[in-house]
Amino acid sequence: MEDEIELKTAPADFRFPTTNQTRHCFTRYIEFHRCTTAKGEESNDCERFAKYYRALCPGEWVDKWNEQRESGTFPGPL
């Protein structure tokens, strides 16, 4: 029997009560990178934040933010 793939998205977050998830996406992206800075790139503790932002954020945004982080122009508090 084949393994089933379970699809999940980020859980509801009281800080983001509306259907527009832009801030939720941005916050989860920042939380992930803060976590990896504090605990290291390979930390399993950070994986949940990665899952959340990957589920919420459009890929184009993530690509742009990654480029900005690499060039030192990312607008968020990392």
From Swiss-Prot:
Keyword entries, A-Z: Disulfide bond, Mitochondrion
Main location: mitochondrion
Tissue and organ expression note: Specifically expressed in roots.
Domain of life: Eukaryota
Single GO cellular component term: plastid
Disulfide bonds: 25-57, 35-46
Annotated protein name in UniProt: Cytochrome c oxidase subunit 6b-2
Gene name per UniProt: COX6B-2
